[in-house]
Amino acid sequence: SAELSEVNLESINSLFNDLSSKPLITDMDVNIQELNVYGYKILNANIKYVPTNKNVSIQILSNDVVGNILWDSKENLLKAGFEKLHLKKNNTLVDDESKFIFSDAPKINIKAKSLMLDEDAYGDLSLIAFKENKMWNIESFKIISPDHTINGSGLWDDEGLSPNTSINFSWDIANIEKTFDQLSYPELIKDGKASVIGMLSWPKSPFDFDKSTLKGNFSLTATDGVVLEAKPGVARLFGLLTLQNLPRRLSLDFSDIFSKGFIFDKINAGVIVNNGILKSNRFSMVGPAAEVSIKGETNIIEETQNIHVIVNPRISDSLSLLSLAGGPLAGAAAFIAQKILKDPLNKIMSDEYQIIGTWDEPEEIQTPQIERFGEMISQEILQPSSEFLNIK
């Protein structure tokens, strides 16, 4: 066995070249203090290398990585299986030192039961990729956690003047609350399910993800959850959207409804991503208490936002239910009248405002509405009433 202080795995790729001839090394047992693997590092690793029958078997054992790599020269296939693959970014490497170099790039099939990059845990990973026309074709990748699953495919140009990664993905979330906890956004949403479908691209490799250079778009659908009370940071912004200030704005007492968050039946959104800025002209959140529509943008790098919010509380339906105290006929009449009048209470009591500033200290700007109340009353109540009662 041998002891080495620092090794780039890419620098010994000659071991894998021309495996039809006798390998340069018959076997190897090396302890490496720092093993650099495409921009990430493995500390205090034991590497065992054994070529057999024109194949190469490598065993890697460390506190952070446990697995085996098999090179099938006949099929030009690199298969890797890891019980644990916990990698830490090596920020001391320059780009040229982290090139994924092979003289004849193999097809890659990687499985890892526990993937972690830096401090971010991703779960179970499977990846199939091959190189074609100087570009890596990511045939498929899947990340499975107990509460969510990501499927995708994509392309990775690692040889051009401007390296780039682009992926198409679908993200199925069985439990939003637990998934957000895993992503370090605890106590933001309770329960809930979601589906996210989109396309994203960024410079450099799939492993060198930088949200400040992220571009693309995605659609979001979420159901049956609760946006919880305001917390510091991004959750503070969500807190504003839970309508906890709505009772003050409407001078009505809804504290029993909103004190513990906003229950939503469904959230729909289409989002454009451009260099870390998320923009949406169609974000809607519907719940038993209100309908919320949002458009604007938020900067996930600077943690700021400029969004326009319209809140339509579902007051008329609630009042219809309360009117049942006067008897079933009274309740039914109130409900039908409100629907014929196109929910005038909901529209008159709607709230409109702008949220700017930072996530930690958002600033709320109320939009004046008094001047439009007269017109709204005429359009939504007087005119429909006249038509319904056949008044001329």
PLM region spans:
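Extracellular beta-sheet-rich ligand-binding/adhesion modules
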Residues: N36, N44-N46
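Small-residue helix/turn framework positions
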Residues: A2-L15, I25-N36, L61-A121, S126-I356, ...
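Short, solvent-exposed mixed-charge patches
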Residues: N390-K392
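C-terminal accessory extensions/subdomains outside the catalytic/core fold
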Residues: D360, Q366, Q379-E380
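Aromatic-rich beta-strand edge motifs centered on tyrosine
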Residues: Y49-P51, K131
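N-terminal beta-strand/beta-hairpin edge segment
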Residues: A45, K54-I58, F141
